[in-house]
Structures are given as C-alpha cells and as structure tokens.
Design a protein with these regions (language model features):
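A non-catalytic alpha/beta surface segment that caps or lines the substrate-entry region
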Residues: 1-26
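Solvent-exposed, charged/polar functional surfaces in cytosolic regulatory/catalytic domains
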Residues: 2, 62, 160
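Histidine/acidic-residue-rich, glycine-tolerant segments that coordinate divalent metal ions
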Residues: 17-21, 38-51, 57, 70-190
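Short coil/turn segments at beta-strand junctions that form active-site/ligand-binding loops
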Residues: 28-29, 72
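Short beta-strand element of the alpha/beta-hydrolase
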Residues: 30-34
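Histidine-anchored nucleotide/phosphate-binding helix
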Residues: 56-64
C-alpha cells in the first residue's frame, strides 16, 4: 500500500490472499508477481515459502518504480496455500476466477538447488485433471459378484501413473489424490 498499489484483501476466497495492482498511464504489458506464503502443515517453511512472498513483493515494488516511464501494469498476488490449503491453492483460485486472463507475464521465485553463484530457471505448467470412476455397488460379503468396484479402477490407475514416473524426466511432476474411496469396507464402491 505504501508503494501506491491498490489492495484487494481478502482475495479469491482466501482470508490471507491479496491482489495488489498498480497501473501506469502508458500502455504496456501486465506483469504479475506471485507471492507464495503460508507454511505447510507439519513441515513449516520446508522449501522456502517464507522467502517467496517477500521476494515477489519486493520485485513488484521494484518494477513499479519504473513502470510509469516504460508503461504497463504491475500486480502482486498473495497466494497462500500454494501446495493446497484449506481452500486449495490460491494460485489455482486466481486462475479460476480470471485474474490471470489479461496477464502477459506471471513470475515467481523459488529458492532451491542451482548454480552457487547464479540463477537457474524452471517452468512448471499446471494441468489439473479430474478422473472419475463409476462402478456398480454391491454388498462385499453377500453378493460381491454383482458389483463393479470403482475403487479398484482408481487404485490401478494411481499405481500405473506411479510406475510411469520412472520414465519421466526429473522436471516432470505428477501428483494425485483419491478424494472418494467408498463409504464402508463391506460395500463395493460405485464411485
């Protein structure tokens, strides 16, 4: 706020999420710095999340200091729950709510291994996929032959993706979670 940004707080359904915007009077690109923060449950700031927010906020303020001369718009989006918080990732919420639709560049910083005296870059695109499996419910003890187990299909697919990872390069990440695995052990799950 001290730097002249307009602040939206909270933003995109996240209590600690924010959107800071500074528009120059000249046309130009829209640049967003993604300020990730909030510790991971049980781990804390395990991979530098305490650094992300400050670094991106500083970068946004630095670009803002020259944007009136060069033109464009600078935004800083505060994105808590980067690896899945109570409301999911705020980055995902910014995407879903259209905050990145008119953005030319979106940048963030992530400390990690790389050259000791320099910078390295990575580009991780995110392509969320929801897979649903449908079967036929049946009592597991009384008439299992009448059921088609949707959970078995989920588990086989999950395991196959796990095996696929050994053929992928180090820079490709695939993560998954089974959000519904049935209702009771003695019922063959339909979904």
């Amino acid at each position: 706020k001290k730097e002249g940004f307009e602040i939206e707080l909270p933003a995109v359904g996240h209590r600690t999420g924010f959107a800071a915007t500074y528009k120059s009077n000249k046309p130009g690109p829209t640049v967003v710095f993604l300020a990730e923060y909030d510790a991971l449950a049980g781990l804390g700031h395990g991979c530098g999340h305490n650094v992300f927010g400050a670094t991106s906020s500083l970068a946004g303020a630095a670009l803002k200091s020259v944007v009136d001369q060069i033109g464009g718009e600078v935004r800083v989006y505060g994105t808590p729950g980067e690896e899945g918080g109570q409301n999911g990732s705020a980055k995902g919420s910014f995407v879903k709510k259209g905050y990145l639709n008119d953005v030319d560049f979106a940048l963030c910083v992530h400390p990690g291994s790389g050259p000791e005296d320099g910078l390295s870059t990575r580009n991780y695109a995110c392509a969320p996929v929801d897979i649903e499996f449908w079967g036929k419910p049946a009592h597991a003890a009384g008439c299992p032959q009448d059921g088609i187990n949707a959970l078995d299909a989920q588990i086989l697919t999950y395991a196959a993706v796990g095996v696929l990872r050994q053929q992928l390069t180090d820079r490709i990440r695939i993560h998954g979670v089974i959000v519904d695995g049935g209702t009771a052990p003695n019922v063959i799950p339909e979904y």
